[in-house]
């Protein structure tokens, strides 16, 4: 936000140096970027008048001008400017003068550019006629009338007077960085309020008192306003101006816009921009002859609707974009830019002034989709107080009246369905002092809060505070504590050291996550991090069932757009996006994982906190990867985390995964012996892969819940002496049904093997010519050992045969010859 000090003085008397002003504003919490002093490098540049113009004898594109600078004799200057004419008042850089620059087509020089007399194609020139750019103004703020050529003055000034003095060009402009939570400071009035509190001086609001409403009729006679989407348009105020004269703005108005970073266009547009900078409330003016039927209708555009904006670009709209329409067509994209079909022209005689409030989320979505960001959209995106609309509209009318640009009709058309009200809360004097570590009297706090236009009631320790509706950031007691702290002065806070003992240590949850990261990175996986704000369409892409908990989203109040409008409930959609992004960049193998928060709104109530927990998602693809690659990673991770005897139970359909190639992962709880689900894993469903542009690619994913892992993790290391007695192994190959899970076979073997069965290891799964259809062969190595003696063949055979009998009778497993 560019704040010219001269302009700020209209609202508050700044009687300190520019340096002190900046220092004190910083100490009261304002983030200051730069303080630039304009035209400090300008010397010996005066106001001159072109008395006579002659053609250059030796150059078609040059002319020789005789310039009256208030002395006895005119001076001669040769120029190639196309817009000079006899009688024009212009800035004249004399011999040995200095201008800020840069000269046309040259880079800017530190310390400015020195101008001396010389000859141009044989004709003497005793100085230079200057453009606005050569006097230090950026091209983007140069008035349209002076964009090409020499700066032609519209008003009379004494000839020979110092140019910077005549036009009051030497002044300071402070650039403040405005944080997203303080949209009220994107306005001169907002910065005046901050300065008032900082310097303990009163400030005044702009004059909005219209002296004569002498336009023909009333505003309601010309226009009606209908809001069809009150969620996206909270208020719409329209005022009508007749007998409009579209012309250049007076210099004082142009100058303020230029120093604030905006290009002057014409008096009507300039006044609306001026008031936007004053109040932070964007405004727009329509030519009433182009508003069909005298109707203003605020509603969403139709999907695919075409609309041409003021910049001449035809744009395709979608049905989530808010449009201002008349009785027949769209005339403006709400909060972003007006339409070419209702633009103010030189012959416009009657206008409608729009002062409306559009929802930040709606404007942000529209602006982002169209790739069109304007001063108006930047303000609406951050949130604007609907109560500004009327004052801003009246201020426009007052300036039109003051500049003679038109006649104001009586009244306004104000559609305000649900008036905005401030939130009143109680704050405590003792808590403010306790948090800040100071001892302020109650009255000091009251004075500070009132200087920010916060109403204070109550008595004793309790202060009942009501902020102005423009301060949408003041919601909790802590917000008011911050206000007291910054206006009191951070530099006045006593420096103290923390007291008490601090116990070092890492919480168990974090230690578990850190161990998981180390383990997975050690296995060659790469960690990724993605946004918690996601699109609700993500769960559709992974084939999540309707009504499932994964669809219980936490919705953002002020999202960046639909693709970032909810908090994620699962990590898999984000993982799929990352895998797809790598795949499209010809990365032939990816093994990745993410550990992040998920948020589930189980109650669907806005005032109840969502269930939040950490989750782990593993994703991989590549020619060497398969289901068992992923399972091996998960099993090794469980070993490190102390998850004993995990169960991988095959599932026919888990939505996101390939039917028959996925499993639920669980573990038997030590508390009640019931299975506890840890997560799911498997090969990603082909339809899901296709959604992400990976058609035909075999992708493997796993998602685990950290709460369940933490509750069932036992990383206690118990001492076990090295075995004294040897082990013996038996290999078995079993012919079983195709759909029989290996986990069930292993569980039965462990159960029947008893205490001497030390280990069971699967080493082969075979399907082929020697195995009949519908069957598979699975082979295990069984290791036996007794800690108290050396096992005999009879000891082993007794237990081993018991295992085989159980497999045959309970699972119909047939022993194959090895």
Over which residues does each language-model region extend?
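Short, hydrophobic beta-strand segments
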Residues: 2-8, 170-179, 234-242, 375-383, ...
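Glycine/proline-enriched, intrinsically flexible loops and inter-domain linkers
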Residues: 5, 23, 63, 203-306
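Conserved mixed alpha/beta core segments that line enzyme active sites in large multi-domain catalysts
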Residues: 47-77, 159, 255, 266, ...
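Terminal amphipathic helices with adjacent charged low-complexity linkers/tails
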Residues: 199-227, 404-432, 438-439
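Mobile "lid/hinge" segments at catalytic clefts and subdomain interfaces of large enzymes
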Residues: 121-130, 134-136, 164-165, 172, ...
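A carboxyl-terminal module marker
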Residues: 434, 451-457, 477, 539, ...
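Extended, well-folded interaction surfaces typified by the phenylalanyl-tRNA synthetase beta subunit core
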Residues: 425-429, 433-589, 783-785, 791, ...
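Phosphate-backbone binding interfaces of nucleic-acid-interacting proteins
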Residues: 1-216, 352, 371, 375, ...
